[in-house]
């Protein structure tokens, strides 16, 4: 559209706040412009003078509040520090814990009497090594349980020989020392016998199903796919990336170690890289192999771990270790076996056609997490040592070490003074839907230790042998200590599980035999015990609801002593207690004095009818 503005007249201002004057020059407004136009924002006089006088002066930047507080300039606005309150640790040692009352389960299904079904495997890839001259098929495990989110899973089978706990521990095929299906991410691929693993994605770690707790153990790992072994392809400057078909890391890791990263990222794993043979712990790499030497395809790496006896290990985590008395903790000439109170707080559940256990897993402690990822080299109370007083997780095991061999040649011992792992150095996660209470976080389920661990990246693959026949074999012991394949721990763990199942059945029979109800506790139901809970209250309202109902029911009434609890827990039968019947107090006193206590209770609550069930929930 053509403009109709007269020639010679100035165009209106593009500023929306500027008024348009008529051609006659008479303003629309008689008053000042700044008083009538609310949208106008005239510049201050100081700014106007600054613009006319010269360039704008540089604005002085004010320090942030944190800097002013650090310099002491804003003391009047610094909030008062809250008074530090010491958190009372209610955790009990594993030796003082009792079995949780078994859940009220329905009768086992006919399928529960059968062993767990073998895992379904789907073929994903095949790898061939020209150096070794062998091929491997790798499969993914379909619908597998994975230990994550603070929980650990195992398999159960119904057994009529265990009428109180109804189920006992079992495993899935293959029945040998191998990599664990449950202790590995979904991205890990296995071969048929689960002795070789690989992944096509980023770093993932697989742990074995056997662990070392004391003694000296050995396993071998052969590189299937990794850094190429052709010496002509090696870089000349030593800084370029080596040609490879993937990368791997080998070592040992505890249950707290993350499986979605490589071994050695945190304090819970010790590993060695294939590139340059660097050892890794706390996410820090150190040169270990000679310059220019790496771990390539076809190499056999031997991993040897040495741990002190559990008896000395227990004194270290309890803070009673004396170097002058206990010495350097050599395993020679010391009895390795000791009585361990295995506490397995488990919830049974059906998973497809199998029956499984769910229990709390151990979780990383704040002290070791800060020590691994913070810039400070040492914690507040000094570096980790057997005598560290800050936390049990910062204590180390004297005499422990990890030695590495390459193709039968000893490369050295890069790791010494490994971190202690017995509770309270390892703590169970407090899951509210898994019978988790603070009192039981120090429970030892018998499977806390150092596991063989392998990490793969971008197609790297490793095959392991945890027992003979070996590719090379363990070395000769320098001090006469026996060196065993860590695969021997598989049969030992079966024996330990069987013994623990029998102990659980006997304890459940003595403590909980003939008692009905859903709310449970340990042998001391007077409010002074551990207060462990279970049953349908846990499945309905969580641990908190069940625990509160148990405490309120037990503490109701004038008397809350053991004799009162004895008659208020459930069906106590006849009031005449004979020598052929064991009461609640009898079962609790069997382990103390050796014989049942058949004394008549001193008093009975008036509101309890003998011979009837009392619902505590």
Curated annotation (Swiss-Prot):
Phenotype of gene-disrupted mutants: Impairs tri- and dimethylation of H3K4. Leads to increased production of several secondary metabolites, including astellolides.
The keyword Zinc-finger is annotated on this UniProt entry: no
Functional note: Component of the COMPASS (Set1C) complex that specifically mono-, di- and trimethylates histone H3 to form H3K4me1/2/3, which subsequently plays a role in telomere length maintenance and transcription elongation regulation. Controls the production of several secondary metabolites, including astellolides.
Keyword GTP-binding on entry: no
Compositional bias ranges of the Basic residues kind: 57-69
Ranges of biased composition (kind: Low complexity): 1-19, 40-50
Region (Disordered): 1-89, 595-617
Domain B30.2/SPRY: 157-380
GO biological process: epigenetic regulation of gene expression; regulation of secondary metabolite biosynthetic process
Compartments where located: Nucleus; Chromosome, Telomere
Keywords: Chromosome, Nucleus, Telomere
Quaternary assembly: Component of the COMPASS complex.
Family indicated by similarity: Belongs to the cclA family.
Protein name: COMPASS component cclA
One function term, GO molecular function aspect: transcription cis-regulatory region binding
Gene3D superfamilies hit by this protein: 2.60.120.920
Chief location: nucleus
CDD domains: SPRY_Ash2
Annotated TM spans: none
GO CC, any one term: chromosome, telomeric region
